[in-house]
Amino acid sequence: MAKKLVRFDWAMKRLLRDKANFVVLEGFLSVLLDETVKIKQILSSQSNKEEDDDKYNDVDILVENSKGELVIIEVQNTKEYDYFHRILFGTSKATVEYIKEGRPYSEVKKVISITIAYFDLGQGDDYVYHGTNTFRGIHKGDILALSDRQKELYNKQKVSDIYPEYWIIKAGIFDEDKVNDKLDEWIYFFKTGEVKEDFTAPGLPEAKEKLDKLKLTPEERKEYEAFVERLRKLASYQQTEMADVQDLIKQEKADIVIELWLDDTPIPKIAKYTKLTEEEIMQIIENHKNKSR
């Protein structure tokens, strides 16, 4: 049986900033971006307020790779309807903050934003989404390209190589019974906290070694257990909140049923208006009669 490792989001905050552990993040980035990635340095997090990060269950890390590109890796556990806007803000902030005043625009760094989401972000059937920026002609349908001189000056092959790039990994909906490639092995780890014996994706063997719960110091173990407890409380709160909302919706529908029934609306019409079955409607009416006695 695969041994349990510490959660990746906590590891990003506490363990993976250590240069000795760069190999774990380098492995993940190399698999995702399909190229060999070497981390030059870990820059300051998008937010230095650790307690706020824990409170809102948002953990991020900002990496500069050997090509001078900025990579934002963010783990998000809670649902936020404006999360797409937040991703845009993060890349924009990194773009502006990491160019020196007075320098030419050509020195703007490429930003790659990677989100590992444990909730169903947006609507879509896939669990990995990739977004790039292209300019397509509205009449001829061609893709606007860099000139040969621009390619030479900026060492870029495509316009999209200049603009921010977005990756969204919906780990929460990943089917752990269907691991088909090395990226799936990483997503399996994100979701389950386990690395199977036959997994060979770069970085995972090192993750299995360096993120072993048994190797935590007493202080690290205490911090980790507190982090996991916060996750449990947050999940419990969300579950309770959802149940309360469902109860409220159920009561509102029952009130509508009784109001229509008292107005002598036929049961089939009530069913049509409320999307309830006739059996459910009759049960609501019966409950109302019992309360009125």
Which role fits each region the language model picked out?
Residues 71-76, 181-293:
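Short, charged alpha-helical interaction segments and adjacent helix-coil junctions
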